[in-house]
């Protein structure tokens, strides 16, 4: 059994929130979990944060950036913030319950 990684306060700045959608629920059947992460987070930082916070073995990390939509408020256009998501693949037999808090 691998030694548990120590939790650093910076790990909480990397992982912002779980993404709970129909598509992410389907991915969870294949040992994958989707998180909203910081814009400047790298794949190794995301992997280290998930392994330390949830005590699981991460096999791989895929990231994507969703560009913010242009909206209107009182007739004036503005742009919503860009969002970075990480699809984290876990080792076989491991899972993360995203309905519980960290």
From Swiss-Prot:
Keyword DNA repair attributed: no
Example GO molecular function: rRNA binding
UniProt keyword annotations, A-Z: Ribonucleoprotein, Ribosomal protein, RNA-binding, rRNA-binding
GO terms classed as biological process: translation
Any Pfam family matching the protein: Ribosomal_L23
UniProt record similarity statement: Belongs to the universal ribosomal protein uL23 family.
Function: One of the early assembly proteins it binds 23S rRNA. One of the proteins that surrounds the polypeptide exit tunnel on the outside of the ribosome. Forms the main docking site for trigger factor binding to the ribosome.
HAMAP family (alphabetical): Ribosomal_uL23_B (MF_01369_B)
Protein name: Large ribosomal subunit protein uL23
Taxonomic source organism: Sphingopyxis alaskensis (strain DSM 13593 / LMG 18877 / RB2256)
């Amino acid at each position: 059994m691998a030694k548990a990684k120590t939790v650093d306060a910076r790990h909480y700045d990397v992982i912002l929130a779980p993404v709970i959608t129909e598509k992410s629920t389907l991915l969870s059947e294949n040992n994958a979990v989707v998180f909203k992460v910081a814009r400047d987070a790298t794949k190794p930082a995301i992997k280290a944060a998930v392994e330390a916070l949830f005590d699981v073995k991460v096999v791989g990390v895929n990231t994507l950036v969703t560009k913010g939509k242009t909206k209107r408020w009182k007739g004036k256009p503005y742009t919503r913030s860009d969002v970075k998501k990480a699809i984290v693949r876990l080792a076989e037999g491991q899972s993360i319950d995203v309905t519980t808090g960290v």
